[in-house]
From Swiss-Prot:
Keywords: Ribonucleoprotein, Ribosomal protein. One of its GO terms (biological process) is translation. Gene3D superfamilies: 2.40.50.100. This is Large ribosomal subunit protein bL27. It comes from Brucella melitensis biotype 1 (strain ATCC 23456 / CCUG 17765 / NCTC 10094 / 16M). GO terms for molecular function: structural constituent of ribosome.
Length: 89
């Protein structure tokens, strides 16, 4: 009796959703307080002056200013925000 054999079952076709990690604001860019600068797993970049570190290691600005990245002698890269001088009104 003619019939079609059972089709194969693929064991592929799964992947995790991307987490959109990485640098969101680059060196020299202006940021506002609360802006996310880096999303990361672990501390590839370390917090410097005027930034905070979230519980998921996200680095964010605590003041308005411009972003700067600096590698120190210990080999660690630190992210800081240089505050903008407020104009006196």
């Amino acid at each position: 009796m003619a019939h079609t054999k059972k089709g194969g079952s693929s064991r592929n076709g799964r992947d995790s959703e991307s987490k959109r990690l990485g640098v969101k604001k680059f060196g020299g860019e202006a940021v506002l307080a609360g802006n996310i600068i880096v999303r990361q797993r672990g501390t590839k970049w370390h917090p410097g002056a005027n930034v905070g570190l979230g519980k998921d290691h996200t680095i964010f600005a605590t003041v308005n200013g411009s972003v700067s990245f600096r590698t120190k002698a210990n080999g660690r890269t630190y992210v800081s925000v240089n505050p903008i001088a407020e104009a006196a009104e």
